[in-house]
A protein has these predicted regions:
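Hydrophobic membrane-insertion alpha-helices, especially the h-region
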Residues: 7-21
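Periplasmic/extracytosolic POTRA-like scaffold domains at the N-termini of outer-membrane
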Residues: 44-85, 133-136, 140-162, 199, ...
Length: 251
């Protein structure tokens, strides 16, 4: 008797399982409800301009959160368009996952220079040569000061920023770029008490190669604080100005 009851219960469980399995199999993916989002923010370790909370807050604020909606009713293209309007986002990809979730991959804009001009302008130049607003967190890039207009920044200074990003030695060494009224460039290094005068923008490969040679064969021998100014303005030569020392007066 007990054996028959157990067999009956087993058959009932098998029947219930088959009913659930068939129902789930026949349910169209479009009718399934979105269970959540999988957010991926690229370069989040180096640049924390955008957070997952910020993305969620933006979607909820525009009533675009896909969670709880039918997968077939979710417009991933609309999500991409809305998120791409954020001034700190470079690219967005939205897609459906097999687990009934919406995947969102965000690429942040990458700043290469910060401009703090005499005219009051304060912004970043990104790696595409476009003006970028100041986010809540700061980026460790060279600061540009002086007589800087936006046209000069995105054309002339952008190429210098790209050069610095491509050369880790100079990216680490150059702390500030000052633009004079004559649109000539002065660099303030992190190491050393000198000013590096580049002159007019351009010829960065040649100028910095000269500076590297001077560092290795000159400053390493005489000391990093011997000169107050190192000029790379002219081809095939470097001119320097000595640091003026104040001598103690005799009693």
């Amino acid at each position: 008797m007990i054996k028959k009851i157990l067999i009956l219960l087993f058959l009932l469980l098998i029947t219930a399982y088959l009913i659930v399995a068939v129902t789930a199999f026949n349910t169209k993916p479009a009718d399934q409800v979105c269970k959540g989002m999988e957010l991926i923010i690229k370069d989040s370790i180096d640049h924390g301009f955008i957070s997952q909370k910020g993305i969620l807050r933006l979607l909820n604020g525009k009533k675009l959160s896909p969670v709880g909606k039918k997968m077939g009713d979710i417009n991933t293209r609309l999500l991409e368009e809305e998120l791409s309007q954020h001034p700190l986002i470079e690219n967005v990809e939205c897609y459906r996952t097999p687990g009934c979730k919406i995947g969102i991959e965000v690429t942040q804009r990458l700043p290469i220079l910060r401009v703090m001009a005499n005219n009051g302008d304060n912004y970043y130049i990104d790696n595409k040569g476009k003006i970028m607003p100041i986010p809540n967190s700061s980026a460790h890039v060279a600061v540009v000061t002086g007589y800087v207009d936006r046209d000069f920044a995105v054309k002339e200074l952008y190429t210098l920023g790209v050069f610095l990003q491509a050369h880790p030695l100079w990216d680490a060494q150059i702390e500030q770029i000052n633009v004079t009224q004559a649109k000539e460039l002065e660099l303030v290094p992190r190491v050393g008490e000198h000013i590096i005068f580049l002159g007019k923008p351009g010829n960065y490969e040649e100028k910095f190669e000269k500076l590297k040679t001077f560092y290795e064969k000159g400053l390493n021998q005489v000391g990093w604080n011997k000169y107050s100014r190192i000029s790379l303005e002219f081809n095939n030569q470097i001119t320097v100005s000595y640091t003026h020392l104040t001598l103690p007066t005799t009693p």
